[in-house]
Amino acid sequence: LTKSANIVGATMRLNPHGDGAIYETMVRLSQGNEALLHPYVMSKGNFGKAYSRDMAYAASRYTEAKLMPICQELFGDIDKDTVDFVPNYDNTTTEPTLLPATYPSILVNANVGIGVSMASSVCPFNLSEVCETTIGLMKNPDFNALETLKGPDFPGGAARLYDEIGRAS
């Protein structure tokens, strides 16, 4: 495990979003169940509780963290010329234009955010169903994804009331 403050500093060398935003993201990525189905950060120390009114967590100098093994699937082939690299914000190093992920992160872990003044919210899907659907689409482009990808993986259960989503594009 590495001190969280060290990780925040290393991240700021690539993109200066500010230490608060970076550390808060680390805290969220360490939260299981409530925030993510599969957390990306293994944490040690008081990382607070996700989505509580006062998400009180200790300062980064008091906590430690490291990436979970699943994260290897997000950038495991990065050194194999699978993606392009561009200079970072101050031209001191380079960073990938995207991650060569072999793990369907957004579909499995969901996503909520605001970017370019547009809000987005993606519900989490079951990893087995996502993999089965992906394999089906690779084998047959006309594969009906709704046969295997029934819908979001809500912990309390859910029912698909109509199939209109199948025609969305």
What name fits each language-model region?
Residues L1-I165:
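Catalytic phosphate-handling regions of large nucleic-acid enzymes and associated NTPases
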